[in-house]
Amino acid sequence: MILKQKFFNRPALKVTEDLLGKFLVRKIGNKEVALMITEVEAYDGFQDKASHAHRGKTKRNEVMFSEAGRFYIYLIYGFHNMLNIVTGKKNYPAAILIRGAGDISGPGRLTKFLKIGRHFNNKKANRKSGLWIEDRGIKISKRNIKRTPRIGVNYAGKIWAKKPYRFFLKQKKLNFQFPICKLLSSFVFSVIIY
């Protein structure tokens, strides 16, 4: 089931945790590639000094102020696209960075593998855009979720750099059954192409 706007129209930290175990799906040509989301980071509002929105709205971050369920894509180091999904109420700037999915760790590697560029910026997460997130019925136990500070945000100062807003799965080899999908490997973290 494709996640609708209602799923994302909630507080960022709640959505962040709930995204673990969901599937990021990208349509490339006539194929769909699906990867289970394994690592995410929350950026929550004006007060979050690690957030692009901390100093207010700019042309670069304006999508963070829009409706939930839109993608926020930006470039770092001149060549890595970062994939975020906007959460919460309109005009409250919050977004979630998708750092890992499937066997891919690292947000730059993920967007490169899925051919996600800045043309997805401000697009809705749905089939029409060619990029969306699905719930395939996997329930992740809280015992299998670890929270740590976000990566590379020391510029935010001691308090915000230490906020435990990064969520990831502790155990990478989980056994699930998918009656509808064919897995190319015994583990859910592998790529599904159908």
Model-derived features: where do they sit?
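Conserved, well-structured core segments that form or line functional sites
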Residues: 1-176
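Short, basic, low-complexity termini and linkers enriched in Ser/Thr/Gly/Pro
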Residues: 138, 173-194
